[in-house]
């Protein structure tokens, strides 16, 4: 996962003047009958944040963003400081845990875990006369597209003779033309959002015709949904979640295999990988980490130390003071790790629960030396 979208957040680090970040993950799902529940949930979160030291102007700024969310919005992540919201992200699912936190650094780990579940894709519910598409980008701003094909002739009849053969041929041609039209719109939509895969549902013949008409690159990323249902229906959602999990796991296992191959090399100079929090911090401080693999434990309260630069990260304040950081500050280790990875353009990969993790659940793969690049 690339973390560049977080840089605007870290440009407003709260350590400089002692103020901090308000981080809120809120379930905003509601209907007309339960609209007040969102307000009650926010009121409870606000009380916790105020007790932790968050200022009124920042809490008011968050309140303005929390209220008035549309009923279909399952959840919201908001990060604010100094009376202003620095980043707001709609969530595709209700947050697993509603979190309210006030600290020097924003608490972004739950957001990244939610984004891990969101791989950009396109859903296609095809019929002989057209299709309904749903584009699902990473940012959660889904959009529906209607493809209208030729409406006649699309049904075969048994009349016999020459006229029947002509009609049958016309029907076949209409099906093929409509499938090509659907495929063209699908390919454009996939390119627009950088889709990793395309789900195609509908009757077996229609699915096959659309998939066969897709450009090769999109066709290779097509997954069938054996149901004739709208693209926002449960079968499509289940298929999207399964394909997302499969792809994420494949990416993470590939990184982990690479890490294992490197860390096991006999010559330390050839390993180009480190493990453990201290090792990962050292690689990030030096700008050597290409990617970080992590098995996150949501219940972990391990802390670490940071400084004014994004890459200032260490397991002890003494380490940073030895590097010239005059006033290190303490925060959760995962918050400091993500900040350092973002600041040095390192990618982040979450390891599946059944993977054998590096020491302390954290490893870093190092960039190739400049002479080898």
Model-derived regions, located:
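Terminal alpha-helical anchor/extension segments at protein ends
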Residues: 1-373
């Amino acid at each position: 996962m690339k973390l560049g979208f977080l840089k605007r957040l870290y440009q407003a680090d709260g350590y400089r003047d002692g103020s901090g970040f308000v981080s809120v993950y809120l379930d905003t799902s509601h209907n007309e009958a339960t609209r007040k529940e969102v307000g009650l949930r926010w009121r409870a979160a606000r009380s916790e944040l105020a007790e932790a030291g968050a200022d009124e102007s920042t809490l008011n700024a968050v309140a303005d963003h929390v209220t008035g969310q549309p009923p279909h919005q399952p959840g919201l992540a908001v990060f604010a400081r100094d009376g202003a919201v620095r980043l707001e992200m709609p969530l595709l699912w209700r947050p697993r845990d509603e979190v309210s936190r006030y600290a020097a650094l924003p608490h972004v780990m739950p957001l990244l875990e939610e984004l891990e579940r969101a791989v950009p894709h396109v859903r296609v519910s095809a019929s002989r006369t057209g299709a309904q598409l749903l584009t699902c980008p990473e940012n959660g701003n889904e959009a529906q597209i209607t493809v209208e094909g030729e409406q006649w002739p699309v049904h075969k009849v048994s009349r016999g003779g020459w006229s029947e053969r002509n009609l049958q041929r016309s029907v076949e041609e209409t099906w093929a033309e409509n499938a090509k039209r659907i495929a063209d719109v699908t390919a454009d939509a996939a390119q627009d959002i950088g889709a990793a895969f395309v789900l195609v549902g509908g009757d077996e013949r229609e699915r096959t015709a659309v998939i066969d008409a897709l450009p090769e690159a999109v066709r290779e990323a097509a997954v069938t949904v054996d149901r004739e249902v709208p693209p926002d229906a449960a079968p499509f959602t289940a298929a999207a979640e399964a394909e997302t999990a499969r792809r994420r796991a494949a990416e993470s296992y590939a990184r982990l295999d690479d890490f294992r191959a490197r860390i096991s090399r006999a010559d330390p100079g050839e390993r180009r990988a480190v493990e453990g929090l201290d090792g990962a911090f050292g690689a990030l401080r030096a700008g050597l980490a290409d990617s970080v693999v992590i098995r996150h434990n949501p219940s972990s309260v391990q802390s670490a130390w940071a400084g004014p630069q994004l890459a200032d990260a260490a397991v002890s304040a003494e380490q940073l003071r030895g590097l010239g950081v005059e006033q290190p500050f303490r925060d959760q280790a995962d918050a400091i790790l993500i900040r350092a990875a973002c600041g040095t353009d390192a990618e982040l990969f979450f390891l599946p629960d059944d993977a054998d993790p590096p020491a302390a659940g954290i490893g870093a793969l190092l960039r190739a030396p400049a002479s080898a690049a």
